[in-house]
Amino acid sequence: MPFCDFHYFSKKLGIQSAAYVLLPEVGEPPFPTLYLLHGYSDDHTVWHRRTRIEAYVANLPLIVVMPHGGHSFYCDAVEGYPYASAIGEELPEIIERNFPAQKDRGGRCLAGLSMGGYGAFKLALTYPDRFAAAVSHSGALAFGHYPYTWDGNAYRPEQQRILGQGYIGG
């Protein structure tokens, strides 16, 4: 299965970013695209390194894009980078210019693990005109509840910079 370590300049982020892209060997273009989002403790390489993603999609006419999302929760951070805009708006346009991807809502879906599961739902709900479906695997969906509101939570300052005080009992 063709694999691309795709690097591009994100105007939204103002920095170089990356995504792993799997291209189908079956079917006729244009292909639907799955945006597969990583969790908080990983990066865009995790799906390729720690799963059998290539085997799972080998016989499907599907492009899989695994973008780098940092520790962003796929949000436009209160203090930091606008990852929701970068991945929800800009990245599909970049992918569709560079790969044989469908260019409509029906050809785009999101899935993610943990932080990426939150991101998949957030992006699908923020951009319903862009994404037809979303899947959350063990999504980090319960902000305001354990463990995010613990005063001793080591991640709390970073989460507050990203999400703002109101999301995590600030």
Cite the ranges covered by each PLM segment:
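Non-catalytic cap/lid and distal C-terminal segments of serine-dependent acyl enzymes
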Residues: M1-G170
